[in-house]
Design a protein with these regions (language model features):
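ALDH superfamily catalytic-core signature
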Residues: 90, 96, 104-167
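N-terminal Rossmann NAD(P)-binding subdomain characteristic of aldehyde/semialdehyde dehydrogenases
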Residues: 1-35, 69
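A structured beta-alpha segment of the ubiquitous adenosine-cofactor-binding alpha/beta core
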Residues: 7-9, 75-98
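General beta-strand structural signal in soluble alpha/beta enzymes
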Residues: 47, 76-78, 99-101, 120-123
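PLP-dependent aminotransferase-like
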Residues: 31-85
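Beta-loop-alpha module in the N-terminal Rossmann-like domain of NAD(P)-dependent dehydrogenases
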Residues: 18, 25, 80-87, 101-108
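Short gly/ser/thr-rich secondary-structure transition/capping motifs
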Residues: 1-5, 78-79, 144-145
Length: 167
């Protein structure tokens, strides 16, 4: 930690098979972010990309194979989100699920995961605020607010949805 008297550490504890269920809007970045953490901890993966971005998933898979990822460490399944996502969460060999997508689907996956004693992490479109303090550079803040809200047409889970401004 950059703060004195604070200790921050990470423990790498493999869980086994981790399912990654990812959205269409960042078809390479989000799977790679999720996979990196799971792989570093010693897990194997089952990657279920969005139905609208199978080609990106296929290219990523080919790159990983060419780079030498061991057989069976990176696995991909293609198909409709509802039935396939539910099947992954309920599968006896899947220990954990990481999902990015809608509130509706994330809520259902949480419930299914709890019923099957799974570790479930869902990112379901946070309500992200930009906070402007009295000493803020207003030009910079205005630019950051607009970019945060409208970059990628607002179709990202980290989009700014409100501004909190001091009086």
């Amino acid at each position: 930690s950059e703060l004195p008297n604070n200790l921050i550490y990470t423990r790498r504890i493999p869980l086994g098979v981790v399912a990654l269920i990812t959205p269409w809007n960042f078809p390479l970045a989000i799977p790679v972010w999720k996979a990196a953490a799971a792989l570093v901890c010693g897990n194997t993966l089952v990657f279920k990309p969005a139905s609208s971005t199978p080609w990106c998933a296929q290219l990523l898979t080919e790159i990983l194979i060419e780079a030498g990822i061991p057989a069976g460490v990176w696995n991909v399944v293609y198909g409709p989100g509802g039935s396939l996502g539910d099947a992954l969460v309920q599968h006896r060999d899947v220990a954990a699920i990481s999902f990015t997508g809608s509130n509706e689907i994330g809520g259902r996956l949480y419930s299914l995961g709890a019923a099957h004693n799974k570790k479930v992490q869902c990112e379901m479109g946070g309500k992200n605020a930009i906070i402007l303090l009295d000493d803020a550079d207003l030009d910079l803040a205005a630019t950051a607010t607009v970019q945060g809200a409208f970059y990628s047409s607002g179709q990202r889970c980290t989009a700014t949805s409100r501004a909190v401004v001091m009086r």
